[in-house]
């Protein structure tokens, strides 16, 4: 026995018809695609109105604005964050912030200068 049975032939014919119909459905009509209206932010709306007449000086201002925003967000802010982290969180003594100064009492000697802290003055007329 060779060849397809009548049921198999019918099934293949139906599959071919389905494929043809599916391919035909994939073709777009002249009205398609229907795109939703594009949302424009207030800042973008301002720049669109500002640049409408095409004056050269307005274009220069816009390019300066765009480059400064890029520099601020991609250079300056990361540098500030790195500086803050290095200054306040990476502590390799003795070249960082002094977290707690040592207490000094009357009669103590300051090591760097050799100065002796004098005793506190007495104020007999004031009460604590």
UniProtKB/Swiss-Prot annotation:
Sites bearing N6-acetyllysine, chain numbering: 24
Record-listed N-acetylserine modification sites: 2
Location (main, coarse): mitochondrion
CC per GO annotation: mitochondrial inner membrane; mitochondrion; respiratory chain complex I
Record field: transmembrane: 64-86
Signal peptide extent: none
Bilayer topology annotation: Single-pass membrane protein
The organism's place on the tree of life at top rank: Eukaryota
Keyword terms: Acetylation, Electron transport, Membrane, Mitochondrion, Mitochondrion inner membrane, Respiratory chain, Transmembrane, Transmembrane helix, Transport
Presence of keyword Cytoplasm: no
UniProt cross-references to InterPro entries, sorted A to Z: NADH_DH_b-subcmplx_su6
Cellular compartment(s): Mitochondrion inner membrane
BP GO terms, sorted: mitochondrial ATP synthesis coupled electron transport; mitochondrial electron transport, NADH to ubiquinone
Role played: Accessory subunit of the mitochondrial membrane respiratory chain NADH dehydrogenase (Complex I), that is believed not to be involved in catalysis. Complex I functions in the transfer of electrons from NADH to the respiratory chain. The immediate electron acceptor for the enzyme is believed to be ubiquinone.
Similarity remark: Belongs to the complex I NDUFB6 subunit family.
Oligomer status and interactors: Complex I is composed of 45 different subunits.
Protein name: NADH dehydrogenase [ubiquinone] 1 beta subcomplex subunit 6
Species in which this protein is naturally found: Bos taurus
């Amino acid at each position: 026995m060779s060849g397809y049975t009548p049921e198999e032939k019918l099934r293949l014919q139906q599959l071919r018809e389905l494929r043809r119909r599916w391919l035909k459905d994939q073709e777009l009509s002249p009205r398609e695609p229907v795109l939703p209206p594009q949302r424009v932010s207030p800042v973008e709306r301002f720049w669109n109105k500002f640049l409408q007449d095409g004056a050269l000086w307005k274009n220069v201002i816009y390019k300066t604005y765009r480059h400064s925003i890029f520099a601020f967000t991609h250079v300056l802010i990361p540098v500030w964050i790195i500086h803050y982290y290095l200054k306040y969180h990476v502590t390799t003594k003795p070249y960082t912030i002094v977290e707690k100064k040592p207490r000094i009492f009357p009669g103590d000697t300051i090591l760097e200068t050799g100065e002796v802290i004098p005793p506190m003055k007495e104020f007999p007329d004031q009460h604590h």
